[in-house]
């Protein structure tokens, strides 16, 4: 039986931490930033943990 391939698109969107948590970049920080307040753009920076209901599906796509 061949090896399972991880989902390339999902691999580019999320990262697995050392403890096994799945983190992602928040949406809304690519364009149209001029109309968004500094507070809002600052709040959107950094990585956030993926919502619990999605974790099982994402781990399956990543082959974990």
From Swiss-Prot:
It comes from the Bacteria. Pfam families: Ribosomal_L35p. GO terms for biological process: translation. Keywords: Ribonucleoprotein, Ribosomal protein. GO terms for cellular component: cytosolic large ribosomal subunit. Residues 1-28 are annotated as: Disordered. One of its GO terms (molecular function) is structural constituent of ribosome. Residues 1-22 have a biased composition (Basic residues). HAMAP family: Ribosomal_bL35 (MF_00514). Belongs to the bacterial ribosomal protein bL35 family. PANTHER family: 54S RIBOSOMAL PROTEIN BL35M, LARGE RIBOSOMAL SUBUNIT PROTEIN BL35M. This is Large ribosomal subunit protein bL35. The gene is rpmI.
């Amino acid at each position: 039986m061949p090896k399972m391939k991880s989902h390339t698109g999902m691999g580019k969107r999320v990262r697995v931490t050392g403890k096994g948590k799945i983190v992602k970049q928040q949406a809304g920080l690519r364009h149209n930033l001029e109309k968004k307040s500094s507070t809002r753009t600052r709040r959107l920076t950094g990585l956030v943990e993926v919502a619990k209901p999605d974790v099982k599906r994402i781990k399956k796509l990543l082959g974990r």
